[in-house]
């Protein structure tokens, strides 16, 4: 799967548990907003599983987020690769390759786009249209609740996004299903808030001799 076929939201609990805890989609979205709007930075381990075209691929690494607008996906399993943005320009590079790809962040066609609400002050209900409790989706973690919606502006590509939300409002999983039937499943572990992250971690300079290619889809 392509990094541009990733992206970025998370699952929450079934309808019955949601009712039991007195939660609805609006209240749950508010809890998520409150958590991430007060946060300045985040570090987490992630796993990403892509299923499509008769194949399944699982990758993993470390995610760094720092406001405003900066994000770094450092893949280390099964091979190193990097997706990074400083808030203006996004880069994708695989060590050892002869090309690095870049795109202005506003032009980027990437499934990570729903994660932009984590990068500034925003509201989940504005980022996802048709936001509701996914009563037929089983959460992976105890006490979790699953939300369903479609990222605004991506209705021509994505049929459904599920977000799993922990009782404290943390997003622990994002599952994105595209119109072609492919599925990207992102899970976030060992989340650390407001950690010190140097600004240089979100800048990228291509190694000598590496060609820079411009495009809106960065990752294969």
Language-model regions, residue ranges each:
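Extracytoplasmic
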Residues: 39-41, 58-60, 66-68, 78, ...
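Gly/Pro-enriched, hydrophobic low-complexity segments
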Residues: 126-216
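N-terminal leader/targeting segments and the immediate start of mature chains
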Residues: 18-58, 206-220
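An acidic-aromatic
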Residues: 62-114, 184-185
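Flexible, surface-exposed loop/linker segments and immediately adjacent secondary-structure boundaries
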Residues: 98-145
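Bacterial N-terminal signal peptides that target proteins for export
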Residues: 1-10
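Bacterial N-terminal signal peptides
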Residues: 9-18
């Amino acid at each position: 799967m392509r990094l541009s076929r990733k992206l970025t939201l998370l699952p929450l609990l079934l309808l019955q548990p949601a009712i039991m805890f007195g939660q609805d989609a609006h209240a749950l979205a508010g809890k998520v907003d409150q958590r991430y709007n007060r946060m300045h930075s985040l570090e987490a381990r992630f796993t990403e599983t892509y299923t499509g075209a008769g194949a399944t691929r699982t990758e993993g690494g470390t995610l760094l987020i720092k406001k405003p607008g900066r994000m770094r996906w450092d893949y280390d399993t099964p091979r190193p690769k990097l997706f990074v943005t400083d808030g203006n320009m996004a880069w994708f590079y695989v060590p050892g390759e002869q090309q690095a790809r870049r795109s202005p962040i506003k032009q980027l066609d990437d499934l990570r786009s729903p994660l932009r609400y984590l990068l500034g002050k925003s509201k989940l209900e504005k980022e996802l249209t048709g936001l509701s409790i996914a009563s037929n989706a089983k959460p992976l973690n105890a006490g979790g609740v699953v939300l369903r919606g479609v990222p605004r502006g991506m209705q021509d590509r994505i049929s459904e996004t599920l977000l799993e939300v922990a009782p404290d409002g943390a997003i622990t999983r994002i599952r994105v299903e595209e119109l072609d039937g492919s599925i990207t499943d992102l899970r976030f572990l060992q989340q650390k808030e407001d950690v010190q992250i140097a600004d240089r971690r979100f800048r990228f300079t291509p190694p000598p001799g590496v060609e820079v290619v411009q495009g809106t889809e960065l990752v294969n």
